[in-house]
């Protein structure tokens, strides 16, 4: 499949111009909001891959520049907001975040978007807690073609080994970003799932037939790759997974390397 330069505007001659619009999706009885970006289409009846983007916690970084770059490269892109945050209905929780990834992928695969998406080419991108949700969704039966994890957050590492850092949950809960069923829901979920959500323990449940690309920042003090990713990575490598691990000299959100990041994400989806 042909991809295009993510750093150049679409070349003339399309049969359908790039466009964008909002999405409303039902997730377990609540409406969640999303948005799609449609690439320029150059052939009648053409279907293109789709990248589904999962944001972190609480989600100030939406990686919209990456979404636009992937759209310019020829992909449909869908980004969305989990239940209980950024206007989506319902209550926020870690388990709801995982369920909502399933919801969006199922929505796309069902054809309900009405877009000419190649549903055999669904790619998943997860940043930080979006990486947590992506991995846990994959471990509970989610089917996609390729996965890119940017600085994924193994929050159960903190639950098991750095409980003092979980005090930040109280601060974020008090920020007003989340609508919660009860004030202690996040701590309660971590106590219940500290073993089954812990990244190394996911490996035996992850699909082995798809390629994984994981990128961590050498200056990341939020979710350092050495502690959050490498124990899982070693187990994946020992069990024959198709996994590529990269490190780059940047922080948790890669603010200093956005153009390089866009090219790297596209290359992973294009070549693997």
Model regions and ranges:
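Catalytic nucleophile-loop/oxyanion-hole region of alpha/beta-hydrolase
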Residues: 58, 63, 83-119
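Conserved alpha/beta-hydrolase
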Residues: 70-89
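Active-site glycine-rich loops that stabilize anionic/oxyanionic intermediates
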Residues: 48, 55-59
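The conserved beta1-alpha1 loop
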Residues: 54-56, 216-217
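Histidine-bearing beta->alpha loop at or near hydrolase active sites
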Residues: 84, 245-255
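Primarily recognizes the serine-hydrolase "nucleophile elbow" in alpha/beta-hydrolase
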Residues: 107-168
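N-terminal cap/lid segment of alpha/beta-hydrolase-fold proteins
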Residues: 1-45
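The alpha/beta-hydrolase serine catalytic core
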Residues: 10-12, 144-233, 238-239, 255-263, ...
């Amino acid at each position: 499949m042909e991809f295009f330069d993510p750093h150049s505007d679409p070349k003339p001659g399309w049969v359908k111009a790039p466009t964008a619009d909002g999405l409303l999706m039902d997730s377990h009885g609540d409406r969640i909001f999303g948005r799609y970006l449609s690439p320029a289409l150059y052939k009648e009846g053409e279907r293109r891959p789709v990248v589904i983007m999962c944001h972190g916690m609480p989600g100030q970084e939406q990686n919209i520049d990456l979404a636009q770059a992937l759209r310019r490269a020829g992909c449909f892109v869908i980004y969305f907001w989990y239940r209980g945050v950024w206007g989506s209905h319902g209550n926020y929780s870690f388990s709801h975040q995982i369920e909502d990834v399933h919801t969006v992928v199922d929505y796309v695969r069902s054809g309900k978007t009405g877009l000419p998406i190649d549903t055999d080419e669904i790619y998943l991108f997860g940043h930080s807690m979006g990486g947590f949700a992506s991995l846990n969704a994959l471990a509970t039966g989610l089917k996609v073609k390729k996965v890119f994890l940017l600085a994924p957050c193994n929050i159960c590492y903190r639950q098991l080994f750095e409980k003092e850092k979980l005090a930040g949950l109280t601060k974020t809960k008090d920020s007003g970003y989340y609508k919660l069923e009860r004030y202690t829901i996040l701590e309660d979920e971590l106590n219940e799932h500290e073993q089954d959500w812990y990244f190394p323990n996911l490996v035996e449940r992850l699909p082995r037939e798809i390629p994984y690309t994981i990128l961590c920042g050498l200056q990341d003090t939020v979710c350092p790759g050495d502690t959050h990713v490498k124990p899982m990575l070693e187990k994946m490598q020992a069990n024959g997974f198709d996994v590529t691990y990269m490190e780059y000299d940047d922080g948790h959100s890669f603010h200093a390397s956005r153009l390089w990041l866009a090219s790297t994400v596209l290359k992973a989806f294009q070549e693997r």
